């Protein structure tokens, strides 16, 4: 029985060999790298169900952060399933050929599945943070656009053989610098004005995100960019960063939101059994002549015009 269980080893690299469209990759993950990807996939999957389970304890109208956070780890679990299966990659000629046997060769496997993951999940991460800070939607959408620039330039740079890849790397770093600025300055101040509990939650999660995200360009530089470390080490490097940036971040964010009403952040969501007031609940018809309360703000708070 023990021999039978031991025989059930990871066979992904045999089923999906290191060849794509007739081109073989020289620098690839080994079984150890695949095993690590499976482990991260498992953590992402368990985290998804945990976040959804925590959401079930909230009213349906208060689950927005649970759904966004669960979506992040759900997408990541699929990406890590793909990479663990030795799929979602393409062989790219390296700019720097190394003598170290772990990174020796001409073609290195580049996991584009990782960038698809980031293209989908990093906007969700930023949405989590910026909605926590109560930032206006135009700012949220603009920061997401800058984030997409960062991810796409990273992918294009990884797929380029020549030194021009570092130009795309520079564009990506500039986009990252702007995102870190928004988190460290504008969003932090906005969250502080919403309330001390919101401010603490944002600082905790925003600081974690800013620090971890700054490490991604370093990983890119020694992996796809410089071909300095082996794909197995690349898997560990990116995997640890993703585990901190997604499930750990998600757990801290939801813990911080446990007593925060989303309505305080401008996220008042109507349930199916609630009445709709097109002009807001405080702008209902005031008399039979159709008079309305025109002294209410957009948030529904009444303002004395003579004050």
UniProtKB/Swiss-Prot annotation:
InterPro entries: Arc/bac/fun_rhodopsins, Rhodopsin_retinal_BS, Yro2-like_7TM. Keywords: Chromophore, Glycoprotein, Membrane, Photoreceptor protein, Receptor, Retinal protein, Sensory transduction, Stress response, Transmembrane, Transmembrane helix. Residues 294-307 have a biased composition (Polar residues). Disruption phenotype: Does not lead to any apparent phenotypic modification, including no change in the photoinduction of carotenoid biosynthesis. Pfam families: Bac_rhodopsin. It comes from the Eukaryota. SMART domains: Bac_rhodopsin. The chain crosses the membrane at residues 36-56, 64-84, 118-138, 140-160, 166-186, 202-222, 235-255. PANTHER family: 30 KDA HEAT SHOCK PROTEIN-RELATED, PTHR28286. Belongs to the archaeal/bacterial/fungal opsin family. This is Opsin-like protein carO. It comes from Gibberella fujikuroi (strain CBS 195.34 / IMI 58289 / NRRL A-6831) (Bakanae and foot rot disease fungus). The gene is carO.
